[in-house]
């Protein structure tokens, strides 16, 4: 399907923009003096090993497949891919989460099986995070090794079972460093989650973990979906190995612009966390250059994934 775009002028002809290029147009268009955007889909990103992650791709670093206890899970997963198609998102880094927390051993094992199934159902579109509860120690580590190895998962997803500075989390981080994979960590700095999620991590906790493990690749989830996002951005200013996922609120303005100004565009990674149009819109609407938008939309995540060791 093509979307007509009217040009200025009473008798100007119509141009058609495909749904696929709707998102990419803002990042790949030529800028001010006609300089072409440097990244193209055919060129590998410098410093990234050969593989399926190329410059020009749009990667959603934070997506979820539907838990199979929901009767509509197949339809919901298909809708996720359809939305990505319409918005020009090439690949989605997905986890499946348990509907109740803390996750049990059987619960997160089942979720990872379903994520692997999603990768098979949508080959090349869905990339998997291995979701674990660190409290299961050896079993959690074995699960990560199994799914990053045998199933090709690209990283680890941690939720709110433990604050990230608790020692029970450290073996997970050390394994992530060994494997060279990122950890996407659920986070919020908000008073209204305290009762329901007493062990929620925030930007300060992630900054502390980053100082303890400077080799770790940490992603702070949904910077604008967890309460005081300005506080979170400032807390992570000097945590150079923490990347900020742009997903979150559908109402807060200027989160991407502030994050770019405070921590720099090289540490921002595009995410939607299921709020697809809002996730895309905040990048399109940011007061950044085409090259900077492309870094956020894909290149920064590509670089993280390219650091994999095993």
Can you say where each PLM-predicted feature lies in the sequence?
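C-terminal segment of N-terminal export signals and the immediately downstream linker at the start
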Residues: 36-66, 70
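N-terminal export leaders
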Residues: 18-35
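Active-site gating/metal-coordination segments in enzymes
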Residues: 90-91, 106-191
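Acidic/histidine-rich helix-loop elements
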Residues: 64-75, 101-103, 193-195
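Catalytic pocket-lining loop regions of alpha/beta-barrel enzymes
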Residues: 46, 151-155, 162-269
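Conserved, mostly hydrophobic/aromatic
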Residues: 62, 84, 115, 176, ...
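N-terminal secretory signal peptides
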Residues: 1-17
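Glycine-rich, proline-tolerant flexible connector loops at the mouths of alpha/beta enzymes
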Residues: 96-107
């Amino acid at each position: 399907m093509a979307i007509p775009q009217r040009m200025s002028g009473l008798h100007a002809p119509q141009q058609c923009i495909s749904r696929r290029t709707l998102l990419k147009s803002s990042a790949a268009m030529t800028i001010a003096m006609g300089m072409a955007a440097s990244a193209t889909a055919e060129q590998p990103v410098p410093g990234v090993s050969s593989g399926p992650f190329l410059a020009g791709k749009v990667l959603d670093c934070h997506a979820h497949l539907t838990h199979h206890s929901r009767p509509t899970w197949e339809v919901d997963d298909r809708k996720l891919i359809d939305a990505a198609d319409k918005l020009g998102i090439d690949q989605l880094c997905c986890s499946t989460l348990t509907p109740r927390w803390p996750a049990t051993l059987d619960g997160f094992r089942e979720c990872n099986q379903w994520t692997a199934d999603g990768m098979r159902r949508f080959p090349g579109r869905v990339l998997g995070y291995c979701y674990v509860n660190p409290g299961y120690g050896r079993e959690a580590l074995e699960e990560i090794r199994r799914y990053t190895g045998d199933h090709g998962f690209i990283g680890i997803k941690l939720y709110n079972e433990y604050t990230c500075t608790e020692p029970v989390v450290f073996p997970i981080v050390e394994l992530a460093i060994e494997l060279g994979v990122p950890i996407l960590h659920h986070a919020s700095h908000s008073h209204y989650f305290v009762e329901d999620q007493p062990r929620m991590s925030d930007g300060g906790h992630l900054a502390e973990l980053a100082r303890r493990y400077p080799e770790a690749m940490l992603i702070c989830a949904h910077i604008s979906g967890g309460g005081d996002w300005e506080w979170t951005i400032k807390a992570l200013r000097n945590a150079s190995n923490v990347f900020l996922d742009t997903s979150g609120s559908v109402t807060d303005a200027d989160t991407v612009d502030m994050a770019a100004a405070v921590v720099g565009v090289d540490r921002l990674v595009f995410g939607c966390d299921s709020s697809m149009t809002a996730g895309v819109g905040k990048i399109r609407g940011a007061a950044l250059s085409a090259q900077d938008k492309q870094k956020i939309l894909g290149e920064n995540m590509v670089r993280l994934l390219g650091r994999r060791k095993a």
